[in-house]
Design a protein with these regions (language model features):
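N-terminal secretory signal peptides and thylakoid transit peptides that target proteins
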Residues: 1-22
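N-terminal active-site segment of His-dependent metallophosphoesterases
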Residues: 30-103
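A short C-terminal boundary segment appended to hydrolase-like catalytic domains
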Residues: 40, 296-358
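Active-site-proximal beta-strand elements of phosphoester/diester hydrolases
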Residues: 43-56, 171-180, 214, 275-280, ...
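Active-site environment of divalent metal-dependent phosphoester hydrolases
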Residues: 55-58, 96-100, 123-131, 181-184, ...
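His/acidic metal-ligating clusters that form di-metal
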Residues: 77-87, 172-174, 186-275, 331-332, ...
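Extended active-site neighborhood of metal-dependent phosphoesterases/phosphodiesterases
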Residues: 100-200, 270-276, 287-291
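Active-site/pore-lining binding-face segments in mid-to-C-terminal subdomains
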Residues: 256, 260-309
């Protein structure tokens, strides 16, 4: 690594921390309450890694497979330099397509984290239903085997794909799984009736605590293409309205939900008292991870770039612009105007650092 690479990366990190610190000073108290009977806690810092899509035999395209292992390794090293991280949440699509060998590779890196890390599965974390999508030289795991492989990182010996954890008194984590591993065509999602009832029960029983909700798929849409019937509708839940209804009913206890899957820059929407975040992908442009600080009163964030070379980041941006499917329908053809519109959605640079009340 040359001095220019190092100084640029350190400048971005230091600048991001300075802005985040300002946001925290403005919006966070030392202890705050959700209600007079709520459990107080000091602000908590945590990180989110999403859509690493690690592939030990891949080539760079829209998904930067050839450097995917390096992206995880560098991100782990950078997160280990963050101060006072309570945990790291990995919000699905750890693998390219359910390969055991890729699972071993990413776990090797994640196990180097000094903060505890928790995992939930995405639609690429189990064996493809269609044998044509299975590559020679790899062995494949079912979603049940994925859960067992990452047992102890959120998953328990029960084998259930969803779970809750107590982070500290007053703060809990709820991980949901809407994947459809036996669906032969769609890569979308739906939360089972059992899981929806469980979620409602969890939030009812912990109404005086703050519950952070995580899921790979999205509760809300981020572009017109994701509406029902659109070419990207499966980025969201089939029964998103049912899930949002439960969260809205418990908005005081579950004011924040964070998803991955969409591969765009960090963004949020507030719906009926709940703030829904989308976390950026580690493996495709803009190749970022996220660090949050939360209290009962507010949430602040930064989304640093993965610490790979400038040439890697430029290649990732060019590969995104070449990937026609990933472009919005109205900007499908490349032009200066259309390319700028595509990058605006995927980079969302105005949200690299920010904060909001919850």
């Amino acid at each position: 690594m040359n001095a220019m690479d190092f100084s640029r990366r350190e400048f971005l990190k230091l600048g991001g921390m300075s802005l985040l610190g300002t946001a925290i000073n403005l919006n966070f108290g030392t202890k705050v309450f959700a209600s007079p009977t709520g459990t107080p806690f000091d602000p908590v810092r945590f990180a989110v890694i999403s859509d690493a899509h690690i592939d030990i035999k891949g080539k760079n395209a829209m998904k930067m497979s050839a450097i995917s292992s390096k992206c995880v390794e560098r991100t782990v090293a950078d997160l280990n330099r963050e101060k006072e991280l309570a945990f790291v949440m990995v919000t699905g699509d750890l693998l390219l397509d359910g390969e055991v060998e890729n699972a071993k590779e990413i776990k090797k890196h994640l196990d180097q984290l000094t903060a505890p890390y928790y995992v939930l599965s995405g639609n690429h974390d189990y064996v493809p239903v269609d044998p044509k999508n299975r590559r020679e030289g790899f062995t494949y795991m079912t979603i049940e085997e994925f859960v067992k492989f990452f047992s102890g990182h959120g998953y328990s010996d029960s084998g259930k794909r969803y779970y809750s954890l107590q982070i500290k008194p007053g703060l809990r984590l709820i991980a949901l799984d809407a994947c459809l591993p036996l669906e032969p065509v769609k890569w979308g999602a739906a939360l089972s009736e059992e899981q929806l009832k469980w979620l409602d029960h969890q939030l009812t029983g912990h109404a005086n605590e703050l519950n952070l909700i995580f899921m790979h798929h999205n509760f809300v849409s981020w572009s017109a293409d994701e509406q029902a019937g659109g070419p990207k509708q499966w980025f969201g839940l089939d029964n998103a309205a049912d899930a949002r209804s439960i969260l809205s009913k418990h908005a005081n206890a579950a004011p924040v939900a964070i998803s991955g899957h969409r591969h765009i820059g960090l963004n949020y929407k507030e719906v009926d008292g709940v703030t829904y975040f989308i976390a950026p992908a580690l493996n495709s442009h803009p190749m970022r991870y996220s660090v949050f600080t939360i209290s009962h009163q507010a949430i602040a964030w930064k989304t640093p770039m993965v610490s790979v070379s400038e040439s890697n980041h430029v290649e990732a941006r060019e590969n995104l612009l070449k990937a026609k499917w990933w472009r919005a329908t109205q900007y499908e053809e490349s032009s200066s105007f259309n390319d700028a519109a595509v990058l605006e959605l995927y980079e969302n640079n105005g949200m690299i650092v920010g904060s909001k009340k919850i």
